[in-house]
Regions:
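Cationic, low-complexity basic patches in intrinsically disordered or flexible, solvent-exposed regions
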Residues: 6, 11
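N-terminal glycine-rich FAD/FM-binding segment characteristic of electron-transfer flavoproteins
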Residues: 30-312
Length: 312
């Protein structure tokens, strides 16, 4: 990383503009360093084409189109916004099968700097407990390879599991401050190592300031996800994510990963039936006539009676 400074230099009779380059050194040596932000994403089945195996109550992923989890993209967008505004290194991580590389490349096309795919048959069948264990250890390994992690972004939940447990689970395992259901990142103060956010509550908005390192779970209201640029797409096409398997985590407790480390039991799953409802258009000479027809049809349907209405 470099700092560029422009100056004027005499060359004979000419004065030319030049750029001086100096190293940007790490804060441990008394200088400055950019924030390191990790974004956790998941490749999920397209919810419009979900199928379920009735025997083991699991999602059938083979042959089903996959996308980046919707909420995770908002976490990535916020990390990229911070990168654009004040400088940051953004590393994206996912645990999943080899085809999840496609989702990581999409994140690279949007502006992420590095991507890590954690994939192994030993991780298969993981519930949220086992997943948070592996992801937390992956973030530890990322910090060893690319420097300490200041912020972690996750989506509030995934479209397939829908539990909202992995983000807080990772924060607990890493002993990070956690800010869930975030709708706005107000300020990231690198000098004070403080972050201020708005959190969505059932009865309002909570304004919270806490210290880095921290983990944030993102809501869709946080931002609008950008589109990939042409240079980003070109870089993504050439990019090869870092791939880690169980062999890269010799200290992992095998009893806490994959199916063995997943105490969750799914009793039953099903795909909701999509019922087709025939609509009816009501027309009349004026608004009053249309309203009269609508009221008459509602009474004929006995809906008001079922709801306890007895008329005026």
């Amino acid at each position: 990383l470099f700092l560029f400074k422009r100056g004027l230099v005499k060359q004979g009779r000419r004065t030319v503009s030049v750029v001086f380059v100096s190293d940007l050194f790490h804060k441990v040596s008394g200088g400055f360093s950019m924030l390191h932000i990790v974004v956790c994403i998941k490749q999920v089945p397209d919810s419009r084409e979900i199928r379920i195996d009735p025997k083991n109550n699991t999602l059938i992923r083979q042959g089903v189109p996959s996308i980046v989890n919707f909420y995770d993209l908002h976490g990535l967008e916020e990390a990229l916004r911070i990168k654009d505004e004040q400088g940051a290194r953004v590393t994206v991580v996912t645990m999943g099968p080899p085809p999840a590389e496609k989702s990581l490349k999409e994140c690279i096309s949007l502006g992420a700097d590095e991507a890590v795919l954690v994939t192994d048959r030993g991780f298969a069948g993981a519930d949220t407990l086992a997943t948070s264990y592996v992801v937390a250890n992956t973030i530890k390994k990322i910090s060893e390879h690319w420097g300490p992690v200041d912020m972690v972004f996750c989506g509030k939940q995934t479209l397939d599991g829908d539990t909202g447990q992995v983000g807080p689970g990772v924060a607990c395992r890493l002993d990070l401050e956690q800010l869930t259901y975030v709708t706005k990142v107000v300020k990231v103060d690198e000098e004070r190592r403080k972050v201020t956010v708005h959190r969505h509550l059932e009865d309002g908005i909570e304004v919270v300031e806490t210290s880095m390192p921290l983990l944030i779970t993102a809501l869709k209201e946080l931002n609008k996800v950008r589109r990939a640029s042409l240079p980003g797409m070109i870089r993504a096409a050439r990019y090869k994510p870092t791939v880690w398997t169980t062999a890269d985590f010799p200290k992992l407790d095998k009893a806490q990963i994959g199916l063995k480390g997943s105490p969750t039991i799914v009793a039953k799953t099903w795909v909701p039936e999509i019922r087709s409802i025939n609509g009816e258009r009501i027309e009349g000479e004026d608004e009053a006539a249309v309203a009269d027809q609508l009221i008459a049809k509602l009474w004929d349907s006995e809906l008001p009676t079922r709801m306890g209405w007895t008329g005026v």
